[in-house]
From Swiss-Prot:
Membrane-spanning intervals of the chain: 104-125, 146-163, 166-185, 348-370, 413-436, 467-487, 514-534, 540-561
Resulting phenotype, A48F: In NPHLOP1; causes hypophosphatemic urolithiasis; results in lower phosphate current, decreases affinity for phosphate and decreases phosphate uptake compared to wild-type; shows a dominant-negative effect; requires 2 nucleotide substitutions
Residue(s) carrying Phosphoserine: S14, S34, S607, S625
Main location: membrane
Tissue: Kidney and lung.
Mutagenesis / variant outcome for changing V408E: In HCINF2; loss of phosphate transport activity; loss of localization to apical plasma membrane; a complete intracellular retention and no detectable actin colocalization
Gene giving rise to this polypeptide: SLC34A1
Record's protein name: Sodium-dependent phosphate transport protein 2A
GO molecular function, one term: protein-containing complex binding
UniProt catalytic activity: 3 Na(+)(out) + phosphate(out) = 3 Na(+)(in) + phosphate(in)
Paired cysteines (S-S): C225-C522, C306-C336
Impact when changing G153A: In HCINF2; loss of phosphate transport activity; loss of localization to apical plasma membrane; display a complete intracellular retention and no detectable actin colocalization
Residues that bear Phosphothreonine: T508, T623
Amino acid sequence: MLSYGERLGSPAVSPLPVRGGHVMRGTAFAYVPSPQVLHRIPGTSAYAFPSLGPVALAEHTCPCGEVLERHEPLPAKLALEEEQKPESRLVPKLRQAGAMLLKVPLMLTFLYLFVCSLDMLSSAFQLAGGKVAGDIFKDNAILSNPVAGLVVGILVTVLVQSSSTSTSIIVSMVSSGLLEVSSAIPIIMGSNIGTSVTNTIVALMQAGDRTDFRRAFAGATVHDCFNWLSVLVLLPLEAATGYLHHITRLVVASFNIHGGRDAPDLLKIITEPFTKLIIQLDESVITSIATGDESLRNHSLIQIWCHPDSLQAPTSMSRAEANSSQTLGNATMEKCNHIFVDTGLPDLAVGLILLAGSLVLLCTCLILLVKMLNSLLKGQVAKVIQKVINTDFPAPFTWVTGYFAMVVGASMTFVVQSSSVFTSAITPLIGLGVISIERAYPLTLGSNIGTTTTAILAALASPREKLSSAFQIALCHFFFNISGILLWYPVPCTRLPIRMAKALGKRTAKYRWFAVLYLLVCFLLLPSLVFGISMAGWQVMVGVGTPFGALLAFVVLINVLQSRSPGHLPKWLQTWDFLPRWMHSLKPLDHLITRATLCCARPEPRSPPLPPRVFLEELPPATPSPRLALPAHHNATRL
């Protein structure tokens, strides 16, 4: 047997130069030691093939997995690289930390612009349909019908995109004696439904990913489902007994209530410096039209003149009167400083421009917010946040968790003074999976309560002669939401809004166009249809509503039995297959919509043809590689 030194001196192996040297490794050279291994053996050098250049090596290679490697044989340099590894890992970590620190202020900036875009969206809807909303409120004969009042509350709140505005109009009408408290209660219920359309629109911005869209749409519609279910139960109860009217009247009579201060403008202090540069509105015009003051019908909602100390004080001047006041040199007023102050455009044109701009800003900020939240909430950070938000209190206080979430939702809504802003802000988090729908449900219920506390504080700022009726209306809003919570939250089996929202989310993730159809039906077509039927008289409404309600209850009952105990049903009723397909499936409508969109869409360019496949059998035979003159059972790595 040859010694290790004799094998090193054999003609098949030559010593390695100081730098360079090619080592052939592959299936045929599995026993060849690497230079790093040989450096650990004292008195040895690495195996190499200095006589084979790159061209010769390329000729001797074969396509069966052999790899050509270049090794650095200097152990000093290897040791230096080992010492420099921590430093090389530290630089990417510092860069990642710097990027995270930079993303936080950017995320706060986009969140600020997102809230401002919601404010501008509300202003745009008021410019486009504010006077129409005032005209709707003006007809007291319509509002005396409870169903018509409910629909009016929905449509007006959708038009002005602010339940606070619609509620303030109702309070003004009750205070002036144009509307009774009992007639205003259904309108309050309708405004509660209409305010939930904003976060549903926000959920549409996450339609790119089906999973995120399913969660976001379910989290947004849980608010709608709660409001609709509460109205379906409490509106007939109120029409039959008037319990909200009697409870609030007793509360107002039992307390010696004095006028207070205005509701604190906590969020507006931050957003108004930006939004007042875009648009300023005179909301008293809508209230005046609703209360029957026809002198302001031709006045613009765009505010022209403001007080110099506070650029919010509204004035009821048209543009022509404003220009004449400027020539008279009114020292107590100065011109407002916003983009549309001197445009001369009508309110509808300004409203449409502002609507388009606010929607673009809303979509841009929301998309960037979602992307940044995706990059920030990764790995352990997302897990920690999910555990903190979605974990219940330890037993036996598990039941307290939901009510604590309600308090948090009410507090946050009181701070931002808008349930739409709060629910729209948590909708992207629901879509990302940070907040579960089970946790978002009590947060949404708390936001419903929080927006009523703001209305109560605003009512306390009313004059003494109007305080009683204004405070009673605000309390009706509060007790309506409390009654809904008592119906649909304390007992887990009664939390139907969560199940309904999840079903809507699954259906919307499968058919994305269903979200737009849902918005049109629930907030426009169905309220308009019910409004038209109710205006024909209660006989027509009962004649149409009773069969429709019975059919709806029958379908719901059969669906529940089909999913839980189909054996109790006859075979033909265990599925809906006996009906035409369009009556129990959305696939036919989906095919029509898909064809329509494909006809309008531009054809996609064809991808270039793929290169021809080369199979292993078609490769040329491999050239045999040189072998080292080493015994098979004496590997250098085993010494």
